[in-house]
Amino acid sequence: MEKELQIVGFRIGRETFGLPISIVREIVRVPEITSIPNAPDYIEGVINLRGRIIPVVDLRKRFGEVVIKADKRNRIVVVELENRNIGLIVNSA
């Protein structure tokens, strides 16, 4: 019997993507983001999530999508990759 893969789906622009639920730690509304000087343009900065400092990547910029102004539907998907937490800004999750 094949193991079922559960995913969290989200959109970036008009494209839909998915991440294995096993790496998703949480999904939060976009809080205040502190910018990081001299970081690549797709690194929005960092957030303080209950005492944890999480770097935040804007996937629209990373994938060359048109960047639109943030709105209340945007979310940050916090994932764990190689024992590090990273926040991914997405259009909706």
Please report, for each region that a protein language model flagged, where it lies by residue.
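An acidic, low-aromatic, low-complexity terminal/linker signal
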Residues: 1-93
